[in-house]
From Swiss-Prot:
Keywords recorded for this protein, A-Z: Transferase, tRNA processing
GO biological process: tRNA wobble uridine modification
Chain residues that bind carboxy-S-adenosyl-L-methionine: K61, W75, K80, G100, D122, P123, S124, Y169, R284
The protein, known as: tRNA U34 carboxymethyltransferase
Pfam families: Methyltransf_9
Any GO MF annotation of the entry: transferase activity, transferring alkyl or aryl (other than methyl) groups
Plastid found in the keyword field: no
Length: 291
């Protein structure tokens, strides 16, 4: 891990010490991968693991199983992963980054496709600690850096494949972010990206006045042609639309593993095709980019 201020904060977090102590007690562990990432370890640790996991709420991406404990996360993230699964053969033997990796769910899922290196980037201490708990039990070779997308071009490693899922609409300068992704690629590298989008044939973007689906840090939601033009402006020459999907209550919903609201509270009570602010309800487009 790189030395940075967030990492220093994380290492001083009380839960980091708890997880370190737990890690020393793990004698046998293995994992399997299906829609959830399933960890099997010493059952005598079950109560300790559950207590730490509860302290780490909210759990957004997943799900996970640790022995008999099922962490039923807000997002059924395997739905998004399965959209990209036909492309996962491209990561075999490759150096792969997951930018905005949350707790590492997608990277854990990628292990079965045998990349040579997996590095996640996310500047969230909470998500890092969730990953640290999971990986202390599963003991995979995945690396996690408490860094954001702007840090990746200067990280010191270039990537063959970059996943950047659900990040770009949080950036106030999306073209600059796309340029940072491009700068982080090896020659012939590819980017898989998803974003919320609006249905419009024009080359435009929605700029929410204050919030979108009650989320304050959403800056731009482009049309698909608007997204394409951002990518071209950033220096990408190939723009392939993989698919689109409207976010529904199967994919995102409130569970006991989050304490806040979820999708049902973000939409218009009388029309689920609109957000509570009156904008189009969330839909996502998945794209593959090449330089």
């Amino acid at each position: 891990m790189q030395d940075n201020a967030l990492l220093k904060q994380a290492l001083k977090h009380p839960l980091y010490e708890k997880i370190q102590k737990l890690n020393l007690k793990v004698q046998n562990s293995n994992y399997t991968i299906d829609d959830s990432f399933n960890i099997f370890c010493d059952e005598k640790l079950d109560e300790e693991i559950k207590n730490i996991a509860l302290e780490l709420k909210p759990w957004r991406k997943g799900p996970f199983k640790i022995n008999k404990l099922f962490i039923d996360t807000e997002w059924q993230s395997f739905i998004k992963f399965n959209i990209l699964k036909p492309y996962m053969q491209e990561i075999k033997g490759k150096v792969v980054a997951d930018i905005g990796c949350n707790n590492g769910y997608y990277m854990f899922k990628m292990l079965e496709f045998n990349p040579s290196k997996l590095i996640g980037f996310d500047p969230s201490i909470k998500y890092f600690l969730q990953f640290f708990l999971l990986n202390s039990l599963a003991k995979t070779p995945i690396q996690y850096e408490l860094l954001g997308v702007a840090d990746v071009p200067n990280y010191g490693i270039k990537f063959d494949v970059i996943f950047c899922l659900g990040v770009i609409y949080h950036r106030s300068d999306p073209i600059a972010m796309l340029k940072q992704l491009k700068q982080s690629l090896n020659k012939d590298g590819v980017v898989f990206l998803d974003t919320m989008y609006i249905e419009d044939e024009r080359e435009i973007a929605l700029i929410p006045q204050k919030t979108y689906s009650k989320i304050p840090n959403i800056f731009f939601i482009p049309s698909i042609l608007g997204l394409r033009n951002w990518c071209y402006r950033a220096g990408f020459s190939e723009f392939e639309v993989i698919t689109t999907r409207q976010t529904d209550f199967e994919e995102q919903r409130k569970t006991q593993w989050i304490d806040s609201y979820s999708l049902d509270q973000f939409l218009d009570k009388n029309d689920s095709n609109l957000t509570c602010e009156g904008y189009e309800a969330p839909k996502r487009v998945y794209v593959k980019l090449k330089v």
